[in-house]
Amino acid sequence: MTLRASLRAAVVLFGGCLLVLGLLYPLAMTGIAGVVFPVQAHGSLMYDVNGSVSGSELIARPVTDPRYFQPRPSAVSYNASASGGSNLGPTNPVFLDQVNTSIASLRDAGVTGPIPAELVMASASGLDPDLSVEAALVQAPAVAAARNSSVDEIRALVIAHRVTDLMPFHPEYVNVNTLNQALDGR
């Protein structure tokens, strides 16, 4: 085989792979995803009562209002373009200050008793909207007090919004975004 024939074969193979893997395959997968999983393919968007996009089920948002459940703290200030966890180790004084600040904030919001670690430490992505059912239930009395509701009513809402994965070893969890939206829709 000559150099010219080898180059031609390489260019044709490159062009074919570029066309198939760079254009046709992504378009096909996007089309299939849009048909089979339309909500997820568009970002699992959430809508308010006016039909406007209020966020995504997949990305936590900062919550300052005591009438809502608090998500996990974010190491990146809930900035999705800079997602990532904290590199601070357990012996770092900055980390200890962040944990103590989170604990104080939860106490100020009315949370009593032991506080689960996930409420004071950021997740690996810094944007995780999910909490264990226990972490949500710890906040239920404070949310109920801020909303002038019964604790049992708020706890029932948490239980109604728990999610169970197909894997038997994965604990149940609650999506804070959908739970907070449900608080306004009760």
Curated annotation (Swiss-Prot):
Describe its function. Part of the high-affinity ATP-driven potassium transport (or Kdp) system, which catalyzes the hydrolysis of ATP coupled with the electrogenic transport of potassium into the cytoplasm. This subunit acts as a catalytic chaperone that increases the ATP-binding affinity of the ATP-hydrolyzing subunit KdpB by the formation of a transient KdpB/KdpC/ATP ternary complex.
Its protein name is: Potassium-transporting ATPase KdpC subunit
Keyword line: ATP-binding, Cell membrane, Ion transport, Membrane, Nucleotide-binding, Potassium, Potassium transport, Transmembrane, Transmembrane helix, Transport
Q: What is its main location?
A: membrane
What does the record say about its membrane topology? Single-pass membrane protein
Q: What assembly does the database describe for this protein?
A: The system is composed of three essential subunits: KdpA, KdpB and KdpC.
Organism expressing this protein natively: Methanosphaerula palustris (strain ATCC BAA-1556 / DSM 19958 / E1-9c)
Can you tell me which family this protein belongs to?
Belongs to the KdpC family.
- Which regions span the lipid bilayer? 9-29
* Pfam families cross-referenced by the UniProt entry: KdpC (PF02669)
In terms of InterPro entries, this protein maps to: KdpC
Could you tell me where this protein is found in the cell? Cell membrane
UniProt KW Cell membrane keyword: yes
Q: Does the keyword NADP apply?
A: no
